UniProtKB/Swiss-Prot annotation:
HAMAP family: UbiG (MF_00472). This is Ubiquinone biosynthesis O-methyltransferase. Gene3D superfamilies: Vaccinia Virus protein VP39. O-methyltransferase that catalyzes the 2 O-methylation steps in the ubiquinone biosynthetic pathway. GO terms for molecular function: 2-polyprenyl-6-hydroxyphenol methylase activity; 3-demethylubiquinol 3-O-methyltransferase activity; polyprenyldihydroxybenzoate methyltransferase activity. It is an enzyme of class 2 (transferase).
Amino acid sequence: MTMSQDSRSTPGSTVDPAEIAKFSKLSETWWDPKGKMAPLHKINPLRLTYIRDAACRKFERNAKSLNCLSGLRMLDIGCGAGLLCEPFTRLGAQVVGVDPSASNIAAAKLHAEKGHMSIDYRCTTIEEMDPRERFDIVLAMEVVEHVTDVGAFLGRCAAVLKPGGLMVVSTLNRNWKSFALAIVGAEYVLRWLPRGTHEWSKFVTPDELTKYLLDNRLVITEQSGVVYSPFADRWSLSSDMDVNYMVVAEQMV
């Protein structure tokens, strides 16, 4: 497979060139809340709150403070156009956003400049980053279902996590329900997402994710399902992890 100039992949990388191409096509619409990334805009407030609260519990911060993440270094892997990077920067975190799509990073930088925000955006992969870099918080939100080797990917994530650091992962479970809702429903019936956005075979079950994390000396301390209510038109946390779910993991002592 040949690589376009809009994407990056190196030998040993877990990046899938086809996955990069999918999201590169959406780069111009990332910040349109009514565009093709509308589902991400709808779920984003819940993701932000979940991550913020987990970080504040871990690092003993007041979640109500406007600068509750001040002094903490955060890495957002697969950051897209910065939908998580910008609000966490506002909360005081020193954010590094990485994405293998050049057009996504260009869109992220442009939007940050318009908002007069200083965010360290890089068109790169976790494998290409300086292994000496360290972060208090590492995010892999809706990423593991798009990589070629989940275990190797999480190993690189764990390597840049500071001792006592926190990792947050969100992904999709793999079962008949997730196929019906996340593939058939979201991509073909409701058309929330472009067809082919996800491959059901790449979805990761909670048990699989737990094992991948443990193999890299990361233990899950919190987990929650994420469900959508069509009547309220909003996402909420739930004990139901059949489709979307998030986990918080810490290094084993």
